[in-house]
Each structure stands twice: as C-alpha cells, then as structure tokens.
C-alpha cells in the first residue's frame, strides 16, 4: 500500500497537478486593477480610430433614477422594439436577456415605470464598457493592438443577433463592425491567387445586413444564400457559423458552401486574405467554425446567383391545443406532404405559432423554384389537399407567383413585442428518421409535447437537396448537416425579469432539449448559431469530434493567447463562462483520467 501511495503522489506531481492547483488563473484586466487603461490611454485610442470610441451606458438608464427622463424613456421604449436600432446601437443586443447578468444588481431592464419602479438602480450587466464603432480595417487593427497591450476582454458585435450573447461580456471592449457597409458586385470575381475567375459574386462589408444585400440584389438582378431576418449581418456569425437559408438552402447549399474569400484581421492585428489558395486553414475554420473565434472578419465574398422566379404556396390549418390527437395527426400529415415535395425537389418550411390562447396555427410554405405557373403548382398539391379533406383536416391554400425572390423577403426591420425576451434552441432531423415510414408521425408527436405560447415559435428549415449534395466540400460544419433532412428551431418567449430568464434557461436545457432529442436519441446534433446556451457537450453536438479537433488545433495556432473567445466557441472550454479568466481544463482532467485508468488496472490485478 505504501508503494501505491508513493506512486500516486509521484504521478500527480509528474503532471504538475499539485502545483497547478496553487497557481491562480490568468485573467483579463478589470477596471479596478492597475493594468486598466487610464483616461489618457482611452482618449488616445479614440483619436487613433477617428473619434469612434463610445463609453457604453445602458439605454435603459433613462428609465431609472438618478437619470430618469420621462420623455427619453418613452422614446427608448419605442426604439428598443426595432431590431435595426438595436443592431446599430453599441449598448444593445437584439435581446435584453443577454444584456443582463444573473443577479438583480446586474441589469438595467428597459421597462416602463408602471411595470417596474424607476427607483430600482440601473447596472451595466453584461454590456461592454467601451465600444469601437470601426469604419475601416485600420480601426480594427488599432483596437486589437490596444486590447492585446492592455490584456482586455475583447468581444465582437456585428448586429447583436446571437442566441448566447456572444457580442457582449462584462468589463469588455467591443469591436462593433456594423458600420462596415461596402457592397460590390462582380460578374466574374477573381479570387486572390487565382486568375481563372469564379463567376458572379458579391463582396460584402462585415456590417451589411440581409435587407441591404437583398435590396442591392434587386437593383443588380442577383441573389445570395441568406436568411430571412432583415437585420442579421450576413458576414458575421450567420456566415461563419454555417448559414441556413429556408428559401435557397435546398437549391444552393449552406452559406458557407458559397463563400469564396474572407478578409480578416487576426489576433496579431495582421490583415490577411483567406481563401482556397492562401491561409487555407483560416479559410476552412471560418466556414462553419463560428464567429468571434478566429479573427475579425471585415469583409467576405460570396457567390451570386440569378434572382430566379418562383411560385410560393402555403397550406394553413388551425386547431385548439386541447384536441391533441387531431393536432398530432394534422402536423404529421403536413410533414408527410413536405417529405413528398422534397422528393420532387420542392422545398419548404413548417411554422407553428399560437395567435391566441386557444388556437394553434400551422403553416406549410412550399417553394416551387423556377416555376411561373401558379395553377400548375396548385395542381401538384391537389392530391395532398384531397387526402387531408378525407381525414377531415381542413386547410387553406394560398399561392402566388414571385418574379424575383429578393422582393419577397422582408426588407424592413422587425418590430418586437415590448419587453419580451426570447431564448432559442435547435436540433436536426436525420434523413434516416424523416424518411422512415413513421418519421413524420414521430416528429409530430415530439412537437406535440412542446408548449407553444402566444410569442413562441416552432419551425423547420429544409436541409437535404444541395446541402446534402455538397458533402464533398471540405468545410468546418458538423458532418451531420449533409445527412439531415431538416433543422428544427424552437423559440421561447421570456417575461422581463431575471427570475424568468433563469427559469427559461433551465427549462431549455433540462426539459425541452431532452424532449427534442427523444425524437432520435442516437442523433444529437444542433446548430451552433441557434443552440442551447447551456449545451455541455457543445464540441460534439455543434461540430463532431473530428471537426472540433481540427478547429481547436487551428485556434491554438492562430490565437494562442485566446484573444477571441466566444461562449460555447472553439477553445472556450479553457475559459470561464464570460471568457475573462483562463482555467485550462486539460491540465487537471488529463491526469485524473490517466489516474482513473491506472486505478482500474490495479483493481483488476
């Protein structure tokens, strides 16, 4: 026994285990520490970026004492509902949930005095202390150098559309890329390092939002693979995380399948071009590895496609939630129609909402690409509608011809309900499940277990098609993207309180994700951009072991000091929740795993 104890102690010491416990974690500089930049240094940074540095104050401060202003508070309450205003403002994310911390003294909730007394103090929460509204690559380089020199927590905000609040962190310096707005269309784009030309493409500044590129596409008669939310930045986390398009993914692939080149400022403040001919590792990582992780992307060039005509048909049914059996049967039939249409190269999206307390709506929207005859599209759907009628499932069918898809997409900023926050999560449905005889019914039964409130949303995004056909492309997305039929996104509304936020986060992780994964327990795959904010196994769920291992290797090479850390991002496992303190897991977990192995061997002998 004495020899065994000697072995254990020697083993632990050989790994540096005991000494590592004595070493405090290395943390970013905080405002109360001597390392924090003084006012002269902040002034110098501001001058170096042409006066674009903002000292961030919560927008809700005008609704609280001692800064309460009834008129200003009313204005902000109205503006805060506008997603475009939130995208452009350094002191806002798209959702108050990620502006607040976890305690009552970590928030500045933007609510009217009738809902919450104005006497309650306002706090910074998770908002950055400073934000650099960069207007050039030189600005980005200067801010990165400043953050490195002063060991500051650095975050990147594009438009603030983020399911886990990656655009903010307490006591941080923010790079706000929203104002990088250049758009340039090229009939035959020449990738750096290749003189052959890559065909039509459009180069987009990091701050270009979907509505802006869609409007530009109308004028120049092209379209791109993009999302539906008009104020999401197309070059930021959307593109770098994968980029799902409900209206063009099936026919043109994911957004990352169609990116030709990135312009990036790296962790050493170097401006580089990343494509298939230079900085290939960085280019690969930025095609699915996630935003805010490998550098600051200042522009990207993506393929442009003809803005083709289409016929859009929508089947809508309504039911009371109390009629569970009817509801499950009806949703199952709509999913069966979607599956049948997919087999005929027609893609679509199922959206489930609750317009009132007693009524649930389900709408199946189908896209007949390159079709101009509405009657022909409806004729193709008639057998399905007749079958629904036989089962006493009443639906309403509407169809329209769309000359160009850009004009069909939302071009104005979304207006959100006042005070309501949202949390969202996602999972993928495999081809194996969806294509099985009981696939649509299994999916519908799981959907029936999820609560849908008046501000909640449950919807699918069509995968398959060109996304599956692109399986030979070497990108940094989870391999399961290529073998999945649909992405399911579940959005839950949250009342404006810290308690409601805490409860909603717990329910997403402990209640609703298990329900979704029960659909196919052996197939747990989620979309990083819309994943569970508390996902414990994010490396496997978002990327898969092989892809993540390669991403982690590239991250260590390009950003060894962890300047770019984002929640549930590559390399974040070695940092605390807010990316402030370095707490390397491997130094402890590896020797413990090895010790456990040796103990098991000893027991067996």
UniProtKB/Swiss-Prot annotation:
Coiled-coil regions, chain positions: none
GO molecular function per UniProt: FAD binding; oxidoreductase activity
Pfam families: BBE (PF08031), FAD_binding_4 (PF01565)
Matching InterPro entries: BBE (IPR012951), FAD-bd_PCMH (IPR016166), FAD-bd_PCMH-like_sf (IPR036318), FAD-bd_PCMH_sub2 (IPR016169), FAD-linked_Oxidoreductases_BP (IPR050432), Oxid_FAD_bind_N (IPR006094)
Residue stretches making up the FAD-binding PCMH-type domain: 122-307
Cofactor(s) required, per the database record: FAD
Protein name: FAD-linked oxidoreductase easE
Gene: easE
